[in-house]
Amino acid sequence: ANLLIATGHKVEREYYFNDAGSQIEQLGASVEAAYLGLLGRPAEAPADGYKGAYVADLATELRAEQGDALADLDPEARRARITDWSFRRMLAGIRQTLSRLGVEFDVWFSERTLHETGAIAETVDDLRERGVVEDRDGAVWLRTTLFGDAKDQPLIRSNGAPTSCGADAAYYRDKRRRGFDRLLFLWGADHHGYVPRRMRAVVRAFGDPDDTAEFLIGQLVSVVRAGQPAKMSRRAGDIATVDDLLDEVGKDAFRYTMLRFSLDAPIEFDVEAVTRQSLDNPVYYVQYAFARISSVLRQGTETGFTALGVDETDLGLLDHPMEAALLRRLAAFEEQVVMAAVQRAPHRLTRYAEELAAAFHRFYAECRVLGDDHALSSARWWLVEATRQVLANTLALIRVDAPERM
């Protein structure tokens, strides 16, 4: 989103959360079983429910907040109360985690609203008028095979309940009706394959060009420590939460490391490597370059150096090979931003930051910035100042801090 805004697009960030359907019901049933277990009232958890350690954490928090009285409610009322509480608590946790990450959304969109406002029924009627809906076996089907899908997709089940495809189609229609002409959907690895194919058919069913929507699929992240699978603190299971990683490595190391990989590449997150204070750690390497640049400029100011005005400076004096290499990297900034935006490839910016940092480190090793030649020192001063600005802009786009000191 930052890249699209930087290249002139008007962007709205939206988080779509699934608060309807079987997943929420399974969450509620799983927490309910764990809650009753804490009270010595064993209850069988659903076979297809959630089994992570966070379920036990939620149950413990629920009991601490609401006591034991929920156990005496009518089972249906208890399930509804616990389901609603569990969902709200999970959503609050997601918001808090994203805030720690420096990720902001303009809109939080509830799937439930599509059901409650009749948007799904309206979507079915719209598609029916377009001649791409068929009633079959008591269900309502979208004829996605007309648009390249392997098989038709149900919109409404035979029992009258909307399917996930029905909700997804309604959500797509809602966004288009709100005036958006380009839609980017970002999903997790569990949506690989069938969801993008199905949604491309939905786009075509509405008569929209293929490039109206893009479907970006992330990959799984494996967390390791010194090459071995890492068990994070607090958890007995085989998952590591983003909060676990943030507690250990911090926002900058987490964001930078994740953004070094293209979206379609599996990620191995080495906890020790990303926190190592050495130049073989990319985030440290880049931030150290910025701190060194700041130190050079600070020392110049403290020693009373005053550069010639930029218009008075003879930049033609920058003829050392390392100066030329640094200038070339600086000149590439705008192209890198545009290409990263067009290709939906933020990892281009982390690689660019590393290349720019490397070019500066080589320049610094071979070219004395503040010497006896005032004209040359002024030219090099402005080169360092330009490097500082471009590196700061690059880090700002990926929302990683640019430290003045390290």
Range-by-range predicted roles:
Residues 1-406:
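Non-catalytic interaction-recognition regions
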